[in-house]
Amino acid sequence: YVVPAAKLEAIYPKGLRVSI
């Protein structure tokens, strides 16, 4: 499923980027 970038930022404060 696709998660909003903001949500990912919240989960990964280090700035992890997931390729979509």
UniProtKB/Swiss-Prot annotation:
It is found in: Secreted. GO terms for biological process: innate immune response. This is Beta-1,3-glucan-binding protein 2. Involved in the recognition of invading microorganisms causing their aggregation. Activates the phenoloxidase cascade. Binds specifically to beta-1,3-glucan. Binds the A.niger cell wall component alpha-1,3-glucan, a fungal pathogen-associated molecular pattern (PAMP) that activates the host immune response. GO terms for cellular component: extracellular region. The keyword Secreted applies. Keywords: Immunity, Innate immunity, Secreted. Coiled coil: none annotated. Belongs to the insect beta-1,3-glucan binding protein family. Monomer. It comes from the Eukaryota.
